[in-house]
Amino acid sequence: MNIAHISEPHEINEQHHIKNQLHWRTSFNCLAPLISIALPMLIHFIFEEDRFEENPFLRLITVLLPLSYSVIQYSALLHTNWKESTKPEDTTHKALHYILNLLLLTFVVISIFSITVFTLDKWDYAASFFYSIVLPSLLIPPVYLFSTSCSFISGQIGFRDTGTDIFIDILILICDIVNVVLVYKESEFLSVFCGLIPGQTGFTGTGTNILINTLVSVFDIVNRVLVYKESKYYLYSAIILFVFILIRILTEKHCPSGKNSLLTAPWRIAVFVSILILAILVFTLIVHVSIKVLNDHLNLPGELNSLRLPKADE
């Protein structure tokens, strides 16, 4: 009798704790991506350029929101994927989990490192525009899609959304892809990469040249299709992403479409891989910018100092 009376309150407390955890996690998933996009944008327009130059705390708050969201979500994904990688499975699946673990850990480390480095940067108007508007619109979509629309469970790795959520997720993905294309083109990152291919890296041949030329052509086509100035497009894109994510959250809350447990369809795997590649490209750019900031801060000469941030209309 006494044991029964003792165990019952314990079970109630445990259920209450689980319920609170679920409520906190749901609230965080709803509010964090929206705040990480909207608040840095508001800070950019509220404060003048010289305030960023004089106040490192203001710079810290601006980059802390999107990068801390990245740290928390990728850490949660790493924790989930790490538990799955410890389960008995074949060598191929275990290797896949270890590769994903390495990538997720890399994303977490880069995000933490960048919080400090970006705060050290000398923020003119272009830098403020990049860190406040461009960076969140690049960084938030992949981690948001990973945390809400993808599965890292063993044997079920892939894109799992159904119904109208698929359409909204694809729009978010396309919007971020265009952002990455424009930033890479404007920063001349692709040009530097292409310049390394023919004579310096040793990778020559018709197939490689065709691939590089195709990439350059795609960048040029996208650049011509978008008739807005880049700075206006980045601002519109950040607003559009905010709206898409808000719609996605509202549909998830009021009209949930459910999740697909059969993730072996090729298109679902392709969407998952696309999100992963997009995240890798975003963090490659972040590393590139971080190295440039360190070079500028330490006055070290180097070719990375030629990297240009996206332009902003003053």
UniProtKB/Swiss-Prot annotation:
It comes from the Eukaryota. It holds the Pfam family DUF2463. SUPFAM superfamilies: Voltage-gated potassium channels. Belongs to the UPF0328 family. This is UPF0328 protein ECU02_0070. It comes from Encephalitozoon cuniculi (strain GB-M1) (Microsporidian parasite).
